[in-house]
Amino acid sequence: MIGDIRKVTAKIAERFKHRFYGRTFQCPVCHLELALVDVNGNRLMVCPVCGVVLDVEEVYGHAVPVVLGVEVRRPQPKTRIHPLATHLPIGLYPFAVLGAGLLLIVSILGPVMPGLAPLLDRAPVLADATLVLLVLSVGFSVVTFFSGLRDWYRRYRRRPYAQIRLKIAFSVIFLVLGGLAIALHASGAAFSSATGLVDLSSPLALVLAAVEIAVLGAGMVVIATLGHVGGTLVFGR
């Protein structure tokens, strides 16, 4: 099952990558997919993963990278917070999505399925736990974002790699989506503060619950893409 999830995540990430990167080629050393637009005016670039200096030439419409050397004096921070901090948002967020989805299902099926009575009783606790997970996930995402910017400034010397630009853009999107999801959930307008469930008799509550689920789903796509692209910057391909 985990393998299937990874395949789906990779397919989603590939779609965004190809639109964002444009034409690409692979580093001949670590096989990281690089964007041709990142090559400077002298046709040179440094691979962000392995540090080789590449001379990228166009041969019959194909990008051919040639290794010229290695960037020896690359900054190597002793404490890199970013790779460690990313695990908390990525690990907690799916459980928040699962909690909200379970609350919606229980809200709809609970009245007609007696077997869900125990979940109905625990719905307020589940709603609170979902909110806590959302706050922790999005809160730690702020730490992840700024530690990533620090890595970009120091380790990658602010070079405008397509991977970095995509990660910055998607990080901002995730923070916006996460903040919106927290606001919706904490307001009690979608999932009642008293019962933890959606008030099926209220059209507004139904619409807001659907909006929250949609926002959470979009956040899953964004954070999965961030994790996939970030992984390539650590391990290559």
Feature annotation, model-predicted:
Residues 22-24, 42-44:
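Residues immediately within or flanking Cys/His clusters that coordinate Zn2+
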Residues 70-81:
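Cytosolic juxtamembrane amphipathic/interface segments immediately preceding
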Residues 81-89, 117-139, 163, 167:
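Transmembrane alpha-helix entry/boundary detector in multi-pass membrane proteins
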Residues 179-199:
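Alpha-helical transmembrane segments and their membrane-interface junctions
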Residues 27-30, 47-50:
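Short cysteine-rich clusters marking metal-coordination/redox-active sites
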Residues 158-173:
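Juxtamembrane helix-capping/reentrant segments at transmembrane boundaries
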Residues 88-103, 130-149, 170-184, 213-227:
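Hydrophobic cores of alpha-helical transmembrane segments in multi-pass integral membrane proteins
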Residues 36-37, 56-57:
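Short, non-ligating residues that shape and space the ligands of small metal-coordination modules
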